[in-house]
Amino acid sequence: MTIYEGTYIGSGLRIAIVVSRWNDLITNRLLEGARDGLLRHGVAADHIDIAWVPGSFELPLVCHRLAESSRYDAIIALGAVIRGATTHHEHVAAAASSGIAQVSLQTGVPCIFGVITTDNIEQAIERAGTKAGNKGFEAATAAIEMATLLQRLNG
């Protein structure tokens, strides 16, 4: 029996992070967590590229373009969608989630969903580095694990 697993050793990997400017109080913290996670696991600082987009709805397009470039072993999408008075947040979250998943499936490059969806700003702050950890850091470790797993699968 063969068991395939990724590792948390990021040396040699090239990672792109795509970050939403909307709710930047939160997304800046997610970005800090993602960069910290990548660096702590051996990804070289000069192998990390960052692209900014207006909002979470725009994440999939830029993730797709970066994945198609063949320059990256994984892409991390970071955003924060917070419930408002209307259902707008549901549409944004659904489009971002579906679009980011399609990037991975269409390009074969892991695109990690680091978009937090919360009911309020307090929950978002908790998920961006306080009580609930930092989802950006978690996305970084998932990116490394998926990139190294695919390298092993590809032989």
Swiss-Prot record:
Q: Which SUPFAM superfamilies match?
A: Lumazine synthase
Q: Which UniProt keywords apply?
A: Riboflavin biosynthesis, Transferase
Instruction: Give the positions the UniProt entry annotates as the active site.
Output: 88
Where do the annotations place 5-amino-6-(D-ribitylamino)uracil binding? 22, 56-58, 80-82, 113
Q: Which reaction is catalysed here? A: (2S)-2-hydroxy-3-oxobutyl phosphate + 5-amino-6-(D-ribitylamino)uracil = 6,7-dimethyl-8-(1-D-ribityl)lumazine + phosphate + 2 H2O + H(+)
Record flagged with keyword Transferase? yes
Per its database record, what is this protein's job? Catalyzes the formation of 6,7-dimethyl-8-ribityllumazine by condensation of 5-amino-6-(D-ribitylamino)uracil with 3,4-dihydroxy-2-butanone 4-phosphate. This is the penultimate step in the biosynthesis of riboflavin.
Identify this protein by name.
6,7-dimethyl-8-ribityllumazine synthase
Organism this protein belongs to: Chloroflexus aurantiacus (strain ATCC 29366 / DSM 635 / J-10-fl)
Q: Which family is annotated?
A: Belongs to the DMRL synthase family.
Binding sites annotated in the UniProt record for (2S)-2-hydroxy-3-oxobutyl phosphate = 85-86, 127
A single GO BP term for this record reads:
riboflavin biosynthetic process
Does the keyword section mention Transferase? yes
Q: Its annotated pathway?
A: Cofactor biosynthesis; riboflavin biosynthesis; riboflavin from 2-hydroxy-3-oxobutyl phosphate and 5-amino-6-(D-ribitylamino)uracil: step 1/2
Source domain of life is Bacteria
Under Enzyme Commission nomenclature, its number is: 2.5.1.78
Q: Which GO terms describe its molecular function?
A: 6,7-dimethyl-8-ribityllumazine synthase activity
List the GO terms this entry assigns under cellular component, sorted alphabetically: cytoplasm; cytosol; riboflavin synthase complex
One matching Pfam family is DMRL_synthase
Q: Kind of enzyme, top EC level?
A: transferase
- What does UniProt give as the signal peptide span? none
- Cited InterPro entries: LS, LS/RS, LS/RS_sf
